[in-house]
Design a protein with these regions (language model features):
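Bacterial N-terminal signal peptides that target proteins for export
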Residues: 1-11
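Hydrophobic alpha-helical segments
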Residues: 12-13, 159
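A generic "folded-domain core" signal
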Residues: 24-171
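Conserved nucleotide-sugar donor-binding subdomain of glycosyltransferases
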Residues: 17
């Protein structure tokens, strides 16, 4: 397998395992801070914490019945990575189209795979989290497989306090 294909396979595999356990495994609510919720769970004997939020506004051409729920996540793994930023769009992204992560006009490209997207490095994750701490709104702009532009807007109200909850529990 060539490196790029292997990388894509690994991302898909681990994201499926991680998010299926996060969403369907036993999770404990650590707290709710305005528009953000903080959770903890065990994943392969490792404690994993995450904060998540749903959009306050969605626009674009799509059939609501065919779209899953969109979320933004920031994840910490005890003894592992901290502040990993990801999104779940609720639709598959069009291949070779960037996903835009926009905090109050500061735009960053995310790497899409199926219905998820991540930054390309932990350095970019740190930048995104800093922007989210200081920001008011987060806008995710993506293109669906049929080519429709979809925009989800999230409030960052409560983000910093929710992040502190997972930092305390899973750093």
């Amino acid at each position: 397998m060539i490196p790029c294909q292997r990388f894509t396979f690994l991302i898909c595999f681990f994201s499926t395992v991680l998010f299926s356990n996060l969403v369907f495994g036993e999770t404990k609510l650590l707290g709710a801070e305005k528009k953000w919720n903080a959770y903890a769970t065990k994943l392969n004997k490792n404690k994993t914490c995450f904060i998540t939020s749903e959009p306050i506004k969605t626009s674009g051409k799509f059939n609501q019945k065919n779209r899953g729920k969109p979320y933004v996540f920031v994840t910490n793994t005890k003894g592992g990575s901290n502040h990993e930023v990801s999104i779940k769009a609720g639709f598959n992204f069009k291949r070779n189209k960037d996903v835009i992560f926009d905090v109050d006009g500061k735009k960053t490209k995310l790497f899409p795979v199926d219905d998820r997207a991540w930054s390309e490095s932990s350095k970019i994750d740190r930048f995104l989290v800093q922007s989210m701490r200081r920001g008011k709104t987060l806008t995710i702009i993506g293109t669906s497989t049929p080519g429709n532009k979809i925009i989800d807007t999230y409030s960052l109200s409560g983000f910093t306090k929710a992040l502190r909850l997972i930092d305390k529990s899973c750093s």
